[in-house]
Amino acid sequence: DAKTGDQLEQLLSTLSLAVTRFQIEPERSEVPPGDALIVCGPKSAPIGAELINRDPALTFTKAGRRWWIEHRPSGERYGSPADEDQPQNADVAYVARHRTDERVVVHIAGIHAIGSLGAVHYLTANLATLYGETDDKSFSLAVRSTYDGLDITGSELAAGPFVW
């Protein structure tokens, strides 16, 4: 997660946005004031679960010992290839932008921590295109990425973006 934070800070700096990093307490369920970029899953902090619960398109679900990103309307699921019987060096992550009044809250949650890093890789390469598709609206999507150790070797859209 530290590497994800570093890469997010670098991305935001290239957009001339000021960054103040801080760690969210594990028991926190409320979004901090102002615009925010939050990296955590629903199992690691209540704030992650709270943000995902606001999303009408995607959610996290657990079946057996595996976590999945699920498209609520269709029930289609996106699981981590790292959790398959024949594991691959790949993961899936959830990305959402919540627009509330004049605030923007971006939420990133990998099924595993490396998935969050893959989401940042995807956003770095596709931010302009993504904005062109979603304008200034709330949306969510799923990203699939491949990795070698802690280095992301590729990323692609797995589902979405779903505008809401």
Model-identified regions with their sequence ranges:
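Solvent-exposed alpha-helical segments and adjacent loops
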Residues: 1-164
